[in-house]
């Protein structure tokens, strides 16, 4: 078992199932619990009450590309969250435990002529590792002004560096 570059949604959605648990050793199961966020695939018959505490969750489409339709509970009202949960259950969407981000002042770049290019905005950050052949090959950072950092939510992609041995 090792952490890899794959998205957590497909892995996380099946990690708690009985078929997976039967295949893992105790050490492997502990590793998965530690490194993969709690994730559930929803069905129309799903009990949605466990997700009522909206600030603990994020909901995403179940397909491979999930920039459209992602909603963090922190970014919406309770009624909007409940509506999105019902829609997500109909569409078999994925619900994950929300991984809190930290915010830092960020230089935006690409400012308009009348804007101060040195002015910073507060942005939430999400880091990740590029893994190649089982080794760390670099670091990436994405940041945004909402709790969902996606292509259509004002995401800023930050530079990355590559580690050479």
Located regions from the model:
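Active-site nucleotide/adenylate-binding loops and adjacent lid/helix of ATP-dependent enzymes
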Residues: 1-104, 108
């Amino acid at each position: 078992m090792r952490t890899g570059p794959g998205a957590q949604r497909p892995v996380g959605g099946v990690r708690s199932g009985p078929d997976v648990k039967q295949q893992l050793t105790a050490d492997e199961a502990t590793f998965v619990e530690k490194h993969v966020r709690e994730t559930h695939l929803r069905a129309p018959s799903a009990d949605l009450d466990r997700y009522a505490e909206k600030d603990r969750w994020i909901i995403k489409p179940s397909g491979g590309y999930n920039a459209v339709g992602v909603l963090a509970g922190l970014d919406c009202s309770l009624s909007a969250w409940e509506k999105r949960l019902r829609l997500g259950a109909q569409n078999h969407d994925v619900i994950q435990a929300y991984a809190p981000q930290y915010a830092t002042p960020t230089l935006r770049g690409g400012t308009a002529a009348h804007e101060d290019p040195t002015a910073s905005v507060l942005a939430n950050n999400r880091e990740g590792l590029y893994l190649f052949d089982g080794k760390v090959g670099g670091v990436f950072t994405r940041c945004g002004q909402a709790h969902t950092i996606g292509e259509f939510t004002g995401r800023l992609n930050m530079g990355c560096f590559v580690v050479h041995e």
